[in-house]
Amino acid sequence: MAQVNGDLPAVNSATAQHLLDIPVIHDGVVAFRNNPFGKKSIAIGDSAYQTFAAPLLPYLARPWGYLRPYAEKADALGDQTLTKVEERVPVIKKPTEELYAGAKGIIALPIRTGFEAKDHVFKTYAQEKKKVGGENLVTYGKAIVSTTLITTSEIIIWVGDVMHYKKEEAKDVVNEKVNN
C-alpha cells in the first residue's frame, strides 16, 4: 500500500471509504501508519496475507461470485447508515484538532470553575475581613459568617436565574407544541 504525504489509498468499499473520510478516523489511521509499532504491525499483516491468503484467492473466486451481491448490498447499507449518522451527529465531521480542543475545554471546565469559585470566596473573605477591621478571632469569625451569607445569597440568586431561564424556555416549547 503506497502512501503519499499521509494520504490513504482509496479502498473498494464505500463504507470503509466513508469511515476514512471522517477526520478523527482518518487522523487515527495516519497516526497508526506513522507509528513504528503500527508500521511493523502492517508489515506483519501484509506478509501474512501474501503468504497465506493470496495463494487461496483463485480458489475463492467462484464462492465470492455468489457472495458479491450480498456484500455489495451490505456495503451500500453501511454507507447509507454512516450518512444518516453524519446527519444526526454532525460533530463527527469536525476536524480532529477542533474536537480535541472542545473535549479539553469540557474536561477542564469543572477544575477551572472550582478555582474561580475558590478565588471568589477568598476575595470576598478578604473584603469582609477588611470591612470588619481588626486582627482577632472575633473579627475573623464575623468575616467568615458574612462571607458565607454573601456566597449563599449569590448561589441562591444564580439558581433563581437558571430556573427562571429554564421556565421561560419550557413555556416557549409548550407554546410551540400547542400552536403546531
UniProtKB/Swiss-Prot annotation:
Give the subcellular location: Lipid droplet
Give the species: Colletotrichum siamense
Family classification: Belongs to the perilipin family.
Name recorded for this polypeptide = Lipid droplet coating protein Cap20
Report, from the record, the phenotype seen after gene disruption. Reduces the cellular lipids content in both mycelia and conidia. Decreases the virulence on rubber tree leaves.
Kindly list the residue ranges recorded as spanning the membrane: none
Question: Do the record's keywords include DNA damage?
Answer: no
Keyword tags: Lipid droplet
| Induction remarks | Expression is positively regulated by the cAMP-dependent protein kinase catalytic subunit PkaC1.
